[in-house]
Amino acid sequence: MYLSPQEKDKLLIYLAAQLARDRRQRGLKLNYPEAVAYLSAAVLEGAREGKTVAQLMSEGLTWLTREDVMPGIPEMIPEIQVEATFPDGTKLVTLHHPIR
């Protein structure tokens, strides 16, 4: 099976996000790469489900809280930008201060 570089990136994000979901479910606080992967994968999945950019930007502010991550992580992530494929094309989704 051949995967393009973009498909490989999405697969790695999914894998890292799954690890982050598992750790969060066990009550562990997420570190920087886990939090970024968790949020990025949620954007990609939301786009795949047909949500709009505006919906994802709004919902993205509720996916993780300060209690879900290690101390200092919210300040390390002032924004996340994810290029996601929507039914009408590829768009850039930006989450500003996604961990509150």
Curated annotation (Swiss-Prot):
It is an enzyme of class 3 (hydrolase). InterPro entries: Urease_gamma, Urease_gamma/gamma-beta_su, Urease_gamma_sf, Urease_subunit. GO terms for molecular function: nickel cation binding; urease activity. Its EC number is 3.5.1.5. The keyword Amino-acid biosynthesis does not apply. It catalyses: urea + 2 H2O + H(+) = hydrogencarbonate + 2 NH4(+). GO terms for cellular component: cytoplasm. CDD domains: Urease_gamma (cd00390). Belongs to the urease gamma subunit family. PANTHER family: UREASE (PTHR33569:SF1). This is Urease subunit gamma. The gene is ureA.
